[in-house]
Each structure stands twice: as C-alpha cells, then as structure tokens.
Regions:
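Short acidic/polar hinge/loop motifs at secondary-structure boundaries
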Residues: 126-165
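Surface-exposed loop/turn segments flanking beta-strands in extracellular/periplasmic regions
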Residues: 246-258, 314-327, 363-370, 422, ...
Length: 535
C-alpha cells in the first residue's frame, strides 16, 4: 500500500507564499511526512463532557476523559473519519462492512463492544441525530441498532474529540451505556489549511483521493466564523478468490460465469464516490457574559458494494425450487390461468452436450416456457448501494448572570437519509418481464431537540470546592420514515405460485404497506451535583 499526502497551512502566508507552496506540490509528490499546524498542545485541556462545571480541565474532571486532538487525524492514512478514530481510540470499533445490506451505506460503529445506539454522539456538546440505517447484518454487535453517521463529518473540521467511557450513563442516561464521543469543531478566527491525500493498496485496488480545506475568519470584532469542506472518492477493494462453485461451472463448460476470470463474488470495501462534506462553526460574544453560537454540517455520498453470487443451477426462487435437482421453469400459460405444459428439466451433472442441456435448449425455443438462465446463463451477483445525505443545525445562547448562574438555551435539528439502489438482479415473480435495476425505497431519520441547562456553584464549608448544582430540561422529537420503492421492487408477480421469489432479489423493496412515518416525543429532566471533597 502507498499513500501520499500534503498539508498547507496558510495562517500566516501571503499570496506569493501560498502560490509557491501549491506550485511545489504540483511539481513533486513526496512521501507522507505529516506535520501539525496546530502548535503545541495545551497543558490544561478544557473538557465539555464528564462534568457540568464551567471550564474544567482534563486533570480536574471527575470522570476519565480521553482527548484526541485535531492534529492526530493528520497522521492517519485513511480518508474516512471512522477509520481514523479506530486507530486512535482502542475501544472504538468499526468494520468495512462487505456484503452487509444497508449497513454498507452507514457503517455501524461502537464503543466497548456494545451496540452503536448505546454510544451517545455529541457535536460541540449537543446531541447528534442518529443515522437512517438500522443494521440487520451487524456482526452480532450492531444487529438491529441505529447509530449516528459519524462519516458525514470531515476530519479537518475537528479541533478535538472527547471520549468518555466510564460512568457516562449515570450522567447522560441510557443512551450512553457504552460511552460518549463529543466532536468539537474548530473555532479559529483566522488562517486556514489545505490537505491533499491520495494513494491505493495496489494497482487498481482501493484507490483514494481526498482534498480538504479549512478557513477561519472574524465574525465582527467579537466572534469567529470557521468553515471546513472535504471532497473525496474511494475505489472498491477486493480480497476475493474465485468461488469453488463458479470455477466448477466454468470447468464444466459454462463460459458465461459472471465476471469471469475475476471472482464471481467480490469481498472487500465498497466504492464511495461523490463524497462531499461541509461544516460551519460560528460564535459571537454578545457582551462580556453572554455568547451566541451556531454550527452545522451537510454531507452526501454514493456507496456501491456487492452481494453474494447467485449460482445458475441451484439458487432458490430464481434458478431452482428444489436445491438444484431440477431447473425452475416458468410457464407463461399457467401464469395466465391455463394448464401447465412446460416440462421438468434436470440440472446437468456434466458440461455442455448432456441430455438436460438439450432439454434446456428446447425450453428456450418454446415461447410458452422460460428459465432465467436465458437472462443470466452464468448466474449473477447483485450490485447494491445507494446515496446518503446528512445535515444538521444547532444554535443557542449561553452565558452567566451577575449572581453566578450559568445558563445555556439551545435548539437543534438534524436529518439523515439513505436512498437504496440495486442492479444486476431481478424480481423472479415478474418472469421474463422483470427489470434488472430497482430503487427499493428510502429510510429517513429526523430529530429535533430543545435544551435548557443551568448550573450554579453553592458554597459548602465541608467541601474543598463549591458544590456545583446543575439542572436542566430536554425535549426531543424523533421521526423515522420509510419511503416506498419502485413497484417492481416489491410486487408479487404472476409467477410467484410457480416458485419464483418476490421482490428485487437481494434487497426487496418497501411496499406501500411497509412505508409510513413513525414518531415520538421524549421529555427528560436531570439534576447533577458535583464537588471536590478534598483538595
């Protein structure tokens, strides 16, 4: 595997210096020697999670919080944020998800081996909405879980990531049983940065190109506006060998094996294209004790992976109805209500020239009979994927009163949408009229949250510090939508009674009966007490 990367920091550059840097990059690519433009890490890192006291450092926090700085992401070879975190946080796990249905589009990530929706994800301390995909093939950990889509955020937009594992549920509720990850966006009011990264594992395998930029600027004299953008494309990888059944069919005389001589079934990372991510973070001091904040993100990407190979002799519901003893022969007249006239055809044990091959040729010549071997003589492997879009906006006002009461009023809204697509497959129940590409439908997750938070230090003589009393209220609306797909993707066709499968093979579409909107409202209150018993 090889990777090349370059980072340009134009915080203090003039135009001639910036042009010179870009020209130098155009002339030569050097091996990746990443360096940080963030400067030395602060000795006292202020944390947001794990405590509700104002401006506590990581050393003073009562809960163990890990800090991953933004500069740490520059040193990673991957272009995907989840893969970067996997190398930096030992208890964070995410797979490449080959052949995993909808989980191919939004990969489920988890902490400490618990389901993804047991991990609370925050951005700038505010709850992030969940992804639209419910993982049905999650490796035994994420099955049935619905976690946040972390890949929708660009790594260049991050100032740091705070990770809290122990005691998170006691402070933040059952959503945080596995822990909390707080993604803190950059807040510089000047300068910027450009990152360019490219590479591949081997020729034609896993090629990646990524360009990202960040710029900070003043927002009046008392604020900042920081923007980040990333554009990326990643080719699919293949760690496959030829399936033994596909090779046996080819050796037996079937020269139409799907994708031959390449593996009939690909096992590897999916292709990710048109991957666009954008983040904005804005802050403004309204006065000495009050500030306004606004931040959000938008992202979209297309993902294309594969499914398992459909053997042309024994695949149920398509090529056979009895495990491969006989071929599944469709009878047009029977589908119309007449008597069946098409014969039973055994699957050949040898190659071309057998008696059953002769019978198969006769079926192909009979307009009343059909087999899907005519459409896919060497079998087929469906290509599955779709497009994912994600956006979120949060805004609020925080500050303090003359009496020392801290407050934070905020509102946020976020949506994640997955539109599915499958091709190189068919709906067996539709017979020879079946299309080979389908839009099975969509999942949409929408969440709206309103928070009111207060905290105040109360002097208590028996403690080494003030007793911090925090309390608050949250209201959250959650809405999950299933959008119906193409009629052909879920339709029960006239050949169903003859043993042919229903719906687009591999990923059946969502019918109008399955489509709908499900929502609920959540109310929560909390009280939090914190003090230093000793110095």
């Amino acid at each position: 595997m090889w990777r090349y990367s370059m980072k340009i920091d134009f915080k203090m550059m003039d135009k001639s210096q910036l042009l010179g840097s870009l020209t130098a990059f155009a002339l030569i690519l050097t091996p990746a020697l990443p360096f940080s433009a963030f400067g030395a890490d602060e000795v006292e890192e202020v944390v947001v999670i794990g405590t509700r006291r104002e401006a506590r450092s990581i050393g003073d926090s009562p809960a163990p919080v890990d800090i991953i700085s933004g500069s740490d992401f520059v040193n990673q070879g991957s272009g995907d944020l989840q893969d970067m975190i996997r190398t930096l946080v030992p208890s964070f796990n995410v797979n490449t998800q080959p052949i995993s249905d909808a989980a191919t589009l939004v990969r489920p990530a988890n902490l400490r081996g618990l389901p993804p929706d047991d991990m609370l994800v925050l951005t700038n301390g505010k709850r992030r909405h969940r992804g639209a995909v419910i993982s049905f093939l999650g490796g035994g950990v994420a099955d049935g879980a619905q976690g946040a889509d972390i890949s929708a955020m660009p790594a260049i937009a991050l100032k740091k990531v705070e990770v809290l594992r122990d005691g998170a549920a006691a402070q933040y509720g059952s959503d945080a049983i596995a822990g909390i990850m707080n993604f803190v966006y950059r807040d510089e009011a000047e300068g910027g940065e450009i990152q360019i990264r490219t590479g591949e594992y081997s020729e034609g395998d896993g090629g990646m190109f990524r360009i990202a930029a960040n710029v900070g600027m003043p927002f009046t004299a008392d604020g900042f506006a920081n923007f980040s953008v990333e554009l990326a494309d990643s080719d699919a990888t293949s760690r496959s060998i030829q399936r033994t059944d596909a090779q046996a069919l080819y050796d037996g005389g079937n020269s139409a094996i799907w994708n031959y001589p390449n593996p009939a079934q690909v096992w590897g990372s999916p292709e990710v294209s048109d991957d666009v991510k954008f983040v904005a973070n804005i802050g403004l001091d309204l006065d000495a004790s009050k500030k306004f904040y606004l931040f959000g993100n938008y992202g979209e990407r297309k993902v294309l992976g594969g499914f398992y190979y459909r053997n042309p002799t024994n695949r149920g519901g398509i090529f056979s109805a009895d495990g491969g003893a006989t071929r599944l022969v469709g009878d047009v007249a029977e589908a119309a209500g007449a008597a069946r006239t098409c014969p039973v055809v055994a699957v050949p044990e040898t190659g071309a020239g057998s008696a059953s091959d002769t019978a198969l040729a006769e079926i192909k010549a009979n307009p009343n009979c059909f087999v899907f071997n005519e459409m896919f003589p060497g079998g087929f492997t469906p290509s599955f994927g779709g497009s994912v879009s994600d956006w979120a906006v949060a805004s609020g006002v925080s500050g303090s009163t003359d009496s020392g009461l801290m407050y934070d009023f905020s509102v946020s809204i976020g949506e994640n949408r997955a539109d599915f697509y499958i091709e190189n497959t068919l709906n067996g129940s539709l017979g020879p009229d079946s299309p080979t590409a389908f839009n099975p439908g969509s999942y949409v997750q929408l969440e709206k949250t309103v928070n009111v938070d207060f905290s105040k230090g109360v002097p208590v003589d028996s403690f080494a510090s003030d007793l911090n009393v925090a309390w608050g209220v949250e209201y959250r609306e959650e809405q999950f939508t299933v959008v119906s797909g193409d009629e052909e993707s879920w339709e029960i066709g006239p050949y169903f009674t003859q043993g042919f499968g229903i719906g687009s093979n591999g990923f059946g579409g969502f019918s109008p009966q399955m489509a709908g909107v499900w929502d609920r409202g959540n109310y929560a209150v909390y009280v939090d007490l914190e003090a230093d018993v000793t110095e």
